[in-house]
């Protein structure tokens, strides 16, 4: 479940830890992921046998569509292996069966992006600068990585407090939609075409 999990499982660097070779799921359909702060690989590569359809509401103000469109476009893959469908006027939760309405949910779209290299180390200087120098949360980058691996919940809570101090968190999103009947044929047909 979830767009983030689907995108993790689509990457050969992730699946190769559990499976031999470059193959993974035959079909993956991520929806409305949070692509800037999820810790995705900076140089994503799709598993060799996977067909991926990425769907996102173009009006989504909770998990922004543009960063995900950009991320999915840079996934290394064979021609025709990846398709992106941005749904005009659709919000987050476009298939919830309820009229879109405002919620005070928190967003992170103004916070520094967090991507990792093939070894799992953060890409760029922004996060190390924040956690080591500006807020002095860790004495070294190794301590930061160790905490993230050994105590991920603690590392996230510490980072979240830092993001609050950075004033990059925001509140107020639109969630909902009655697009299930419109979307379901595309959803079902994608899996029929790629699994049967």
What residues fall within each predicted segment?
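Short glycine-enriched nucleophile-adjacent loop
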Residues: 3-18
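C-terminal catalytic histidine-bearing segment of alpha/beta-hydrolase fold enzymes
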Residues: 81-196
């Amino acid at each position: 479940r979830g767009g983030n999990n689907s995108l993790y499982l689509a990457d050969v660097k992730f699946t190769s830890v559990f499976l031999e070779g470059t193959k993974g799921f035959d079909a993956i359909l991520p929806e409305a992921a949070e692509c800037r702060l999820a810790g995705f690989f900076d140089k994503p590569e799709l598993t060799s046998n996977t067909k991926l359809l990425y769907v996102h509401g173009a009006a989504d103000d909770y998990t922004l569509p543009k960063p995900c469109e950009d991320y999915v476009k840079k996934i290394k893959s064979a021609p025709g292996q990846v398709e992106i469908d941005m749904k005009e006027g659709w919000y987050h939760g476009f298939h919830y069966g309820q009229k879109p309405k405002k919620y005070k949910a928190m967003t992170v779209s103004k916070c520094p992006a967090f991507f990792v290299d093939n070894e799992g180390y953060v890409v760029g200087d922004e996060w190390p600068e924040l956690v080591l120098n500006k807020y002095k949360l860790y004495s070294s980058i190794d301590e930061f990585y160790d905490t993230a691996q050994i105590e991920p919940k603690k590392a996230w809570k510490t980072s979240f407090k830092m993001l609050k101090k950075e004033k990059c968190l925001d509140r107020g999103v639109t969630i909902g939609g009655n697009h299930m009947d419109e979307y379901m044929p595309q959803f079902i047909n994608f899996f029929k075409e790629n699994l049967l």
